[in-house]
Amino acid sequence: MAIIDQFLDFTKQRPFTFFDQGDAFRAHVDMTEPYCPELRQLIIKAASMIKVPVQPIGCYVCAEGPRYETAAEIKMYQKLGGDVVGMTGVPEVVLARELGVCYSGISTITNWAAGLNKHPLTHQEVVAVMRDNQAKLRELILKCLTVAGQSSINCDCGQNIEGES
């Protein structure tokens, strides 16, 4: 699992803002730290407490899907700094930031990407690995809730929206 701290958005057809519905208010949201640093640290701490190994940083590449990526796309994502590739997580991270909501992502790694493994990618492999990791992920989420209940998050997630009317 990786507690991602950055993302690259390669989606094309998803709604990506709350501020495009003809609102008089337009927002320009700082995405320097797209995931709440305080919440990320809470997740890392919770993982450590239950001895679940996590990668504490990582750049998530969100691809449109539903197809898997080509080997050339994976190579490009690597060159751009991507560590993990998936089809979820964007636009949620952007929308959470627009609302000033603390948000973080836990990436469960389910398979080697195209070109990094000798056998073809299959959805069955992804489902099997997710099933195998389900208990560990559930335990981590429950521990996060316990730690969050005993913690105070003092971040700037709600302070970085600049808009114009």
What spans do the regions from the language model cover?
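Glycine-rich phosphate- or other oxyanion-binding loops that anchor nucleotides, phosphorylated ligands
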Residues: M1-N117, Q124-S165
